[in-house]
Amino acid sequence: MGHLFAAPYAIFEPSLCFVLTIDSKPCGYVLGTSDSIMFSDICEKKWFPELRKRYLLPNKEEDTLENNFLRYLHNKQTQFKWAKDYPAHLHIDILPLAQKKGYGSKLITVFIKQLNYLNVKGVHLVVGKKNQNAVGFYKKVGFQQLKELEESIVFGKKL
């Protein structure tokens, strides 16, 4: 999962990668891109081809998290219906020991400050519907629901 949702951001857009540490130990991060379409193009040319060779498309339609990620990797990410108004996107992950202590809000604030510095007008993200803690968190930090998909929700925030 890190090869898909973390590493390419650190390589291609390191100015939008922030790590949360407590007592010098990493326990969370927020990362993303200022331009989802441009980032997708770069990944299609420079990142995904090698990953697709390494992680083959599963033969079975088995509905596991790993298989879903592999199918995501092998489907070219070309549609960003909300990218005109919300061109940036982000991923955030915080270990349980650091959750519900205000660190998530602080990470989002740092990320958005950097987007403002880059003159980006909006940011979006996708979260699984079953992750109700995250859904509540994004609403709390000012994201609005843009679209409800089969298994996920797209949130956006104007800057």
Describe these PLM feature segments.
Residues 1-17, 23:
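Active-site rim helix/loop that mediates acceptor-substrate recognition in acyltransferases
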Residues 37, 124-126, 139-140, 144-157:
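Conserved catalytic-core motifs of GNAT/GCN5-like acyltransferases
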Residues 37-91:
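Conserved acyl-donor/pantetheine-binding loop and adjacent beta-alpha core of acyl/acetyltransferases
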Residues 86-88, 115-128:
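Conserved GNAT acetyl-CoA-binding A-motif
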Residues 91-94, 100-114, 136-140:
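Conserved acetyl-CoA-binding loop-helix of GNAT-fold acetyltransferases
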Residues 104, 108, 131-134, 151-155:
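Short glycine/proline-centered loop/turn elements that form peptide/ligand docking sites
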